[in-house]
Amino acid sequence: MIDHIAFWQAPKVLETLKLQALGKPVAMLLGHPSSRYQKKDLLFIDNWEPDSVTELKVVLLAPYATINLIRDFQIEKKIKPELPEIVEELMLCPNPRCITHSEEVPHKIRTKEGRLPFECYYCEFRYSHDQVKFL
């Protein structure tokens, strides 16, 4: 289960991570009351355990998300993915004038001390999680 997704962002997370391609049952809860965020979304994926790249993608799309591994209707493990300071070869810079769109250079994105906003390593274009596009 992916918990603490920003309100109305679960469809984007589901589509971007291609979770429906897993062939597992998926349930989406939109606008669930939250004491911390007022409203939040959740994704329930039956019998799912993400790899490290998927965990990183989750935190890039939903910075406050928690991944809960559920077995026999109990939370077995909570994973709070953290943003590294540099993300390489995973995300595209949204700036159309960035060198990464015309030259063969590695795609690199900086996070300031593991926080938002993201910043392109080359053009220093700053953007937030709602502008993330993966390679």
Predicted regions and their residues:
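Cys/His-clustered metal-coordination modules, chiefly Zn-binding fingers
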Residues: 73-135
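Interaction interfaces in information-processing and related assembly proteins
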Residues: 1-79
